[in-house]
Amino acid sequence: MMSKNFRFSVRTFTNTTARLANYGKPQNPPIDPTLHMRISPIERTGETIDVKRARLVYQSRKRGILESDLLLSRFAKKYLKQMTMEELDEYDKLLDEADWDIYYWATKNYDTTPLPKKWEDSKILKLLQKEAENEERVILRMPELDEGDFINGGKETSLSEVKN
């Protein structure tokens, strides 16, 4: 019985000693602030237009940041059904960007996150910026998910045909 108690107290003492010996020392290696790592988005080939729209609706709604979720889900509900395959591709590439970058670009907060040249002439980003202005001054909430809002029966229409 005595030996079990002795082993327990030795382990506790050793563990405590190790903690005290490392007290005040950094526990993690330093982070290199110049290191930039980006995971390439998945290349999707052979998607039908309806499957692509459905995926983009999901990606617009499930960003992880509430501000982006609200802005992009309302945008998707309003415009996704009318987008052509080329416009959907552009929107897909925009969704590959970081959430806060999209949010700051949509709200034209270029001091925080400068707008890259590749998005300066983007028709989709301009439309998103217009939507972000919220001229109707409505309270933003996640729109209801309805299949008819993003499935267009495989037809392509253009955003220029959308009547606001």
UniProtKB/Swiss-Prot annotation:
Family recorded in the similarity comment: Belongs to the SDHAF2 family.
More details? This protein may be expected to contain an N-terminal transit peptide but none has been predicted.
Q: Name one GO cellular component term.
A: mitochondrial matrix
> Where is it localised?
Mitochondrion matrix
What Pfam families is this protein classified in?
Sdh5
SUPFAM superfamilies attached to this UniProt entry:
YgfY-like
Q: Look up and give the organism this protein is from.
A: Lodderomyces elongisporus (strain ATCC 11503 / CBS 2605 / JCM 1781 / NBRC 1676 / NRRL YB-4239)
Where does the UniProt entry say this protein principally localizes?
A: mitochondrion
Protein name, per record: Succinate dehydrogenase assembly factor 2, mitochondrial
Offer one example of a GO biological process linked to this entry.
tricarboxylic acid cycle
Q: Does the keyword Chaperone apply?
A: yes
Tell me the function of this protein.
Plays an essential role in the assembly of succinate dehydrogenase (SDH), an enzyme complex (also referred to as respiratory complex II) that is a component of both the tricarboxylic acid (TCA) cycle and the mitochondrial electron transport chain, and which couples the oxidation of succinate to fumarate with the reduction of ubiquinone (coenzyme Q) to ubiquinol. Required for flavinylation (covalent attachment of FAD) of the flavoprotein subunit of the SDH catalytic dimer.
Q: Which InterPro entries match?
A: SDH, SDH_sf, SDHAF2
State whether it acts alone or in a complex, and with which partners, per the record.
Interacts with the flavoprotein subunit within the SDH catalytic dimer.
